[in-house]
């Protein structure tokens, strides 16, 4: 279904003519998940996003659907259980996006190590049990030092004890957002990017009945009426709530910044994802991950109080991460000049969630008796000497000793909250990408109840565990072969097998729609046929309005295909200018915006400062 600039115009027109059941402010993964479930459940739904979809936070993650193995060190079993369960659901509803990618975790004999070899084995076995992959080909493996080095020969050898391999999943975070958004659009949601909420509309009793917003592309004020409004703006949540609390600061959020750096894989060669202690005795671990022909690594975790729209990578961030990777891969000698791209993102942490870190990890301590009992029970289960029920009982005992006290009953997942202010505004905040569906489900359960109680409207919430996102209509048990079949179809449209396979992986069950564009398109000047199809599909079916939308969020060109990016800039801008009928002034403005983003990402300012 079309999802274009024209779709946006019509959506804004219709939003101003209706009294929506639900208006969503924020088009990251949280808002996208709410929009999908709301529209599919029959609510008259609207969504506005002040930037591009996923631009703020949801495209700036570590790009994993991460199971959180390290939180089993404190036996925070609940968060890991929730995470691996939700990860399995996401794999079911978006099977073309999360892909299994076994993770290597080296263990070193040094102060502050997250795991000993013994604890790693217990944690991995428990993790497999929770993930339902025990006694399958995806089950964990314990590795000797020699086996670790055979897999990753460039790892630091000194102090290396061995390691483990366990199941994890890579993710395309921005694609997950846009596929949720597209499905919501197909189900009738009215959706527009580059529309900023500026204030609430209030009735005589001070209750919210809509939003005053501004179309940032035309600078026109827009009035949108809605029975209920939900704030899903992540780090901006406090700013939205501030509309009704002028002069009264709101500090629900405590954003922290996470930075990732990208280098060529020849500079930092890894054959599989690696998750390793920093070696700085700071209680942190970093990921070193292959993607395309690049390697990226991160992340930092520092409190942030600056510009929420444009968090920057600082020299301190670079020094920290280079120090870690050069310690763990001593022959790499990565310098700032090797960095081809980067990104800085904000984690929307809740300031009151003091017992948990950004992944919901519990900081409570486990008693020796509880730990020993759980270890013995897991061992017995693995040896078929005890039951799963016995393991679950032992887990409950550990949870009791480590759980957060007096958890807010309104929380719909660990590390997240769902609240309603006195003026009627709902705010769904916190959480992590893996939790997005569950968070939306919890929020919609409450919203549907309020719509019935306060407005007399009845809706039945869909079962979102089985409701695929756009592009996700693929058998989750047969993903590779179905993607390959789509790729074969692409070759019949004149694409090379490599290009067809790339597009099939990117678009999933929407790939035939992309290939069908060959009936009306030929390769644009300076672009391959595949690039032309991808660009036009992004403009007409994914509301890509700017070159940065295309290069950074509809595709990963700007992050992981830096070698070929420069040759694509002018042809892509030319094609977009023709498609959107940009003036010369608008074309220059769009190119300037793209060049600024590229300069930020490749750290031109920091590199120039060092040279100076």
UniProtKB/Swiss-Prot annotation:
Its cofactor is FAD. Its EC number is 1.1.3.21. Gene3D superfamilies: Alpha-glycerophosphate oxidase, cap domain, D-Amino Acid Oxidase, subunit A, domain 2, FAD/NAD(P)-binding domain. GO terms for molecular function: glycerol-3-phosphate dehydrogenase (quinone) activity; glycerol-3-phosphate oxidase activity. The keyword Transferase does not apply. InterPro entries: DAO_C, DAO_C_sf, FAD-dep_OxRdtase, FAD/NAD-bd_sf, G3P_DH_FAD-dep. PANTHER family: ANAEROBIC GLYCEROL-3-PHOSPHATE DEHYDROGENASE SUBUNIT A (PTHR11985:SF35), GLYCEROL-3-PHOSPHATE DEHYDROGENASE (PTHR11985). The keyword Cytoplasm applies. It catalyses: sn-glycerol 3-phosphate + O2 = dihydroxyacetone phosphate + H2O2. Residues 399-418 are annotated as: Disordered. Its main location: cytoplasm. FAD binds at residues 21-49. Keywords: Cytoplasm, FAD, Flavoprotein, Glycerol metabolism, Oxidoreductase. It comes from Streptococcus pyogenes serotype M1. Belongs to the FAD-dependent glycerol-3-phosphate dehydrogenase family. This is Alpha-glycerophosphate oxidase. One of its GO terms (biological process) is glycerol-3-phosphate catabolic process. It is found in: Cytoplasm. Pfam families: DAO (PF01266), DAO_C (PF16901).
